């Protein structure tokens, strides 16, 4: 199922389709937003990855209750809006496609650093989260990601983080690892689109696309997604 306004998004020659079916999920998700992740190095903005976020259709009815009257600008500026996406009771799927080559260690250590920073700021960093971070780092330990390859995350409301890899932009049918830790599963997404998320462009895209979807007739009716 896809709505007319759910279109593909192209980020630096990487095209993310309107809908996908993640590995090991029976559900089809819609493309909620996408954008580049980069860093300002000296006087140049260096783009490292293209990030996209897909959501289960149930997300629309859940999020619209609080946010359907807000403008794109209001959503973009609201930390709570993105927090509701991160913690909402629906599945999420994220794809990170390389623009620049990265090693698994480079990628995973930066994500882990961001996750730990989030937990420490909230005072919720425990031994359980430290163990989950160790598992996360070990999944990426010996991997390399050339341009065009992808890392894929599926976040389940029950607290599992499923990790998959692809040599290109396609969605694999098999998974590489599953880590059972709710805080980690949410923190990986929060590190992308949360208060200090690494991709402001993806946040802007999410706010714009969801703002328009909320206003489409019937889109936020849970019965229309069955």
From Swiss-Prot:
GO terms for molecular function: chalcone isomerase activity. Mostly expressed in flowers, and, to a lower extent, in roots, shoots, and seeds. Pathway: Secondary metabolite biosynthesis; flavonoid biosynthesis. It catalyses: a chalcone = a flavanone. The keyword Isomerase applies. It comes from the Eukaryota. It is an enzyme of class 5 (isomerase). The record marks 107 as: Important for catalytic activity. Its EC number is 5.5.1.6. InterPro entries: CFI, Chalcone_isomerase, Chalcone_isomerase_3-sand, Chalcone_isomerase_bundle_sf, Chalcone_isomerase_sf. Substrate binds at residues 49, 114, 191. Coiled coil: none annotated. Keywords: Flavonoid biosynthesis, Isomerase. GO terms for biological process: flavonoid biosynthetic process. Belongs to the chalcone isomerase family. Part of the biosynthetic pathway for all classes of flavonoids, a large class of secondary plant metabolites, many of which are brightly colored. Catalyzes the intramolecular cyclization of bicyclic chalcones into tricyclic (S)-flavanones. Responsible for the isomerization of 4,2',4',6'-tetrahydroxychalcone (also termed chalcone) into naringenin. This is Chalcone--flavanone isomerase 2-A.
């Amino acid at each position: 199922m896809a709505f007319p306004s759910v279109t593909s998004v192209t980020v630096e020659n990487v095209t993310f389709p309107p809908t996908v079916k993640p590995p090991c999920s029976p559900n089809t998700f819609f493309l909620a937003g996408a954008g580049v992740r980069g860093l300002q190095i000296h006087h140049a903005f260096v783009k490292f990855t293209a990030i996209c976020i897909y959501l289960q259709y149930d997300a629309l009815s859940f999020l619209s209750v609080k946010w359907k009257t807000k403008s794109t600008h209001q959503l973009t500026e609201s930390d709570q809006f993105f927090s509701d996406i991160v913690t909402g009771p629906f599945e999420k799927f994220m794809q990170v496609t390389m623009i620049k080559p990265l090693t698994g260690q480079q990628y995973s250590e930066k994500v882990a650093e961001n996750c730990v920073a989030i937990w420490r700021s909230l005072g919720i960093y425990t031994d359980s989260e430290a163990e989950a971070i160790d598992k996360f780092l070990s999944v990426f330990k010996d991997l390399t990601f050339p341009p065009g390859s992808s890392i894929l995350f599926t976040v389940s409301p029950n607290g599992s983080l499923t990790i998959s890899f692809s040599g290109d932009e396609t969605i694999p049918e098999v998974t590489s690892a599953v880590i059972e830790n709710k805080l980690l599963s949410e923190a990986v997404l929060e590190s992308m689109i949360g208060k200090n998320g690494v991709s402001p462009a993806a946040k802007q895209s999410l706010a714009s696309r969801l703002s328009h979807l909320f206003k489409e007739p019937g889109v936020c009716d849970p019965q229309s997604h069955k």
